[in-house]
């Protein structure tokens, strides 16, 4: 027990400086609990407010697609150049070294494949297992306008409810319904519904016309999906336009690991997202690093 006779009365109380409460920097996240904000701060760089996620969760429905045949050989060398990893729990446990020290957004929906209806997903991971894996968020697909729209929205609701109990953020990933055009109106609808259900981050697609309306109408951070493989210059232009129009990051897979020079491409994306560089300057960086 401490010697009570040796306890000195405190003197430096800073009486002329009231304690300050700094608002949390991330859009739509100011009212969240400390643990939730802490995990979001792992994902979104506190200095820039933005993020670069490396997505390599495609195998959960595509299998060993090009570039993902061997995660240990082709993807692991990229870890140090990204902010966040997005993968499944199977890959996380079997391939990702624990000493990687990168926050993880865990793919938490599944139970489908490219051979069946893609929108027919279920929650595939419990929040308890996500906590065991020490991840920073859980992600699930939401398919507005699809055959299984209702179930996909329920999946988001389930993750939000369970995650809120333990301080675990949820990222909703917008899929495209069969009969919906891939345009601003559709993605405004899909992102807003996901946010209204309580998702803390929305991953969606960039569109050439009206993307600023999508980000303005969504009360939580939007990160863009990379989508299909594009020429590097076009992919960087997409990144630049998305950030310029209000996206707070990118979650790219094929445009990174299917690039001729994945590390150079990640450095170029970093220049756009965190450095504010134009696509032209970032592409020159890519060529220099290639």
From Swiss-Prot:
NCBIfam families: PRK08227.1. The keyword Transmembrane helix does not apply. This is Uncharacterized aldolase PM1278. Signal peptide: none annotated. SMART domains: DeoC (SM01133). InterPro entries: Aldolase_TIM, DeoC/FbaB/LacD_aldolase, DeoC/FbaB_aldolase, FbaB-like. The keyword Cytoplasm does not apply. Its EC number is 4.2.1.-. One of its GO terms (molecular function) is fructose-bisphosphate aldolase activity. Belongs to the DeoC/FbaB aldolase family. The active site is at 203 (schiff-base intermediate with substrate). It is an enzyme of class 4 (lyase). Keywords: Lyase, Schiff base.
């Amino acid at each position: 027990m401490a010697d009570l006779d040796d306890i000195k009365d405190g003197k430096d109380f800073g009486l002329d400086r009231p304690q300050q409460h700094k608002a949390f920097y991330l859009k739509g996240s100011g009212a969240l609990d400390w643990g939730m904000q802490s995990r979001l701060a792992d994902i979104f760089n506190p200095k820039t407010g933005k993020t670069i996620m490396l997505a390599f969760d495609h195998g959960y429905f595509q299998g060993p697609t090009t570039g993902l045949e061997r995660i240990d050989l082709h993807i692991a060398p990229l870890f140090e150049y990204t902010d966040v990893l997005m993968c499944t729990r199977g890959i996380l446990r079997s391939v990702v070294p624990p000493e990687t020290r990168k926050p993880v957004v865990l793919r938490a929906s599944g139970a489908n494949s490219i051979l069946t209806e893609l929108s027919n997903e279920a929650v595939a991971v419990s929040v308890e297992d996500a906590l065991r894996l020490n991840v920073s968020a859980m992600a699930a697909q939401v398919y507005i306008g699809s055959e299984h729209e209702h179930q996909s929205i329920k999946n988001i609701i389930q993750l939000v409810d369970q995650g809120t109990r333990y301080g675990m953020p949820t990222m909703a990933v917008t899929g495209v319904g069969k009969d919906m055009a891939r345009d601003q109106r559709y993605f405004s609808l899909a992102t807003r519904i996901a946010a209204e259900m309580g998702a803390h981050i929305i991953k969606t697609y960039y569109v050439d016309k009206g993307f600023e309306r999508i980000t303005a109408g969504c009360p939580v951070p939007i990160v863009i999906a990379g989508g299909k493989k594009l020429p590097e210059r076009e992919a960087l232009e997409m990144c630049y336009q998305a950030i310029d129009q209000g996206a707070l990051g990118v979650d790219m897979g094929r445009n990174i690991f299917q690039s001729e020079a994945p590390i150079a491409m990640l450095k170029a994306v970093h220049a756009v997202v965190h450095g504010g560089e134009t696509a032209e300057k970032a592409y020159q960086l890519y060529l220099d690093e290639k």
